[in-house]
């Protein structure tokens, strides 16, 4: 069960959508914000294998930036409970950057690409 006002993050590659659960019981998602990559020339994901493509590196950088944003939100007490729905690659990259406090607030992870899905489809995946 997802608690009232829980933050739900739906991410894939180069985009993420933040929702809040507005239902007192069950899941009813209200979109709060859409995020896209910041183009930071000096910041990269870190050392990558030689076979990494620029697209892969961009996606890894976005996943890192998203995780850092979520870490800040958690550390500023803006998140009491968190659910993350992301494609497996993005989810794996994000996990590498989770703060310990974020991990404590994390109530659900779903490894699926649902950035184009409706709120009802996302709620079903979280169910």
Language-model features: where?
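Terminal alpha-helical anchor/extension segments at protein ends
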Residues: 1-127
